[in-house]
Amino acid sequence: SVKKDVFHNWENPFYTAVGDIEQFNDELSKIDSDLFEAILPLPYFHIGSEIANTYNIVESSFSIPTTISYKTGIPMIGVCMSRTSFNQTISNLSLVKVPHSAIPFVNSFSNDKFILIIKSNYSLSEGELELLSHANLMTKKEDYELYSIQIKALKEYMNEPKKLAQYLLETQDSLYVVQDGRGQYISDIDDVIELNFDEMPNRKGMFDTGALILDKPGDNLILEVPFSSPQDSLILIEFWVKAKSYDLAKTRLLWQRITKDKKMYPPNFSLLEMVKSVADDWWLISLPVENVEELKSLKVWTVQSTNAPLHIDNVLIRSSKSTVIRKKGNILQKDNYFWSDSK
């Protein structure tokens, strides 16, 4: 069974997780710390401060990588009960959740170095299995296996948009893609091959996602997100925005939560802090929304303090379970999430 409390049973999760170093002497003698950028534990674990938690963990999947990291000094990508950046969390989870998706932080790694993968004897996700198939086996023990994958090979693995599209089409009935300001549903990989994914601001991320093109969004955008028995404690709303950096800096997001008992929270303002550039004048704005189990609906809108209109090309709402898109009254529904542009 899944041990959800494996970390919470220790007074100090790190030091009490470090096991007998001597049992790893043979393996440690084969590991040159200078060759490795990081350790990636599989199954991947993440228990951070933003509630985007994974719990498919057994004790060995934490204690073995922690022990080897402690002895070698190689940093570990997994997160256990620490303050975490939401953007970094998205990147980390993307590495193991969706095969062939672009992971920004890996681009800073040296092509000549390697990632040390430590696999415990526990079931892996499809994304983890796909990643592992590109790695080389170093050592196989009773409780764990060591693999290595060169950063150059990892970058090539991440830069295969056609394979990413194929994977997404295998898990969805259709894929909604955006190019040159127009969106279309596709259901055949041959149609995907004709599209230039490198020029598309709408990249599929770690979640099962969709995108909406707003034909005439106007100066401001308002969304109303109703919920019905949500499966997750966190969702992510993303805005792909085309704007000059000055106009973007003067724009704020305002959101208001309404709970199932009809309690209406005061609106909250937020400067667009979670922003990254994706192309010339294209920006990705992320708004994480936590504790959605309590929500009946969520309203989000932009407020500008400049006269220049902010062109919002499309909007994504992501969750780790489902996404539903509404475009001009046409509803594509998966599970219990959906969203609509409110008048």
Predicted regions and their residues:
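Extracytoplasmic
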Residues: 1-74
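Luminal/periplasmic acceptor-recognition loop/helix of membrane-associated glycosyltransferases
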Residues: 19-22, 57-120
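Extra-cytoplasmic beta-strand recognition segments
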Residues: 75, 168, 173-176, 181-183, ...
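Aromatic/acidic, Gly/Pro-rich catalytic loop(s) in extracytoplasmic/lumenal soluble domains
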Residues: 109-204
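Short carbohydrate-recognition loop motifs
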Residues: 193-221
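Beta-strand acidic-aromatic groove motif in beta-rich domains, primarily in extracellular
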Residues: 246-258, 298
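Extracellular carbohydrate recognition and processing domains
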Residues: 262-295, 307
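Short beta-strand-plus-loop segments that form exposed binding edges in beta-rich domains
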Residues: 300-308
